[in-house]
Amino acid sequence: MERTLVLIKPDGVKRGLIGKILNHYEEKSLEIVALKLISASKDDAKEHYREHEGREYFQGLINYVTEGKMCAMILMGEKAVDVVRKINGDKDPVKAELASIRGEFTLDKTHNLVHASDSPESAEREIAIWFPELTCKDSYKKTVDLFQKIDGPIINV
C-alpha cells in the first residue's frame, strides 16, 4: 500500500467541490486516512513548492495557495500516487480527460483545483509538511518531551 498527499486548493474549497472531488477518489477504492482544512502559511507553501522556486510563476503560485482555505488529505491504496494523478487529470483542462477532476471542474490552467504528489518520496516529504503530527520523527519528539516532563532529562545514546 502506498500513501499520497492531495491538496484541494482554495478555488476548489471556495466553489464547494470538496465532496465531489472526494467521490472521485473513493470510487477508485482509495482510502482517506487523514483529512483537514488548512490555511497555508507562505513559509509552508514555499517549502511545499520549493522545486519551483526561481521560476516566473513561483510567487503567483504561492499567492494562489495561500489566498484561502485548502483541504489537505492523505490517501492510501495500491499505486496511490499514480492512481490519484490519473484521477486528477492533466493540469491543462483542455488536455484533461473529461471524466477527470480537472476535466470536469477546472475553469482555467492556473486555478487547477488540486495538487497531488508526483512520487512516493515527494508524498512523504509533503505529508511531513502538512501533517507533521503524523510523522514518526514528530511522534518520537512528543514522546521524549512527555517523558522529560515526567521523569526528567532523557539521555540519548
Task: List each model region and its residues.
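Non-catalytic terminal and connector segments of soluble metabolic enzymes
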Residues: M1-V157
